[in-house]
Amino acid sequence: MKAILIDVKNQLVKEVEHDDTLDNIYELIDCRTFDVVSIDGKNSIYVDDEGLYREDQLYFEYFGTEHSVRLAGNGLILGLDRDSGDSISTTLTTEEVKNKVVFLPDGFSINPSMEVTEWV
């Protein structure tokens, strides 16, 4: 199926073929675990779930229709079949994604944090 890879190391956005396996996602985005960020209700970006903890990590910002999000490491855009929950070919074009991605400069970082709030 058609997917779009956001390659932070080479600062490229390109179409790739996804074989609908978890191993292929791990390989394409170079990770051990992943998280999924919905970007428009029809497409999602798969990213390294441990990306914030990698040293010398590179980042990109995706400017969606309503908001932007800064993400660590490579991203893989796949479509979503809302009825079944399955991944499908993305509905976006490479050009559309190129126009929505900005690669952040070397040295940019996000410090992961967690805050516990007492409920009263």
List where the protein language model places each region.
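Domain-length accessory/inserted modules outside core catalytic folds
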Residues: M1-V120
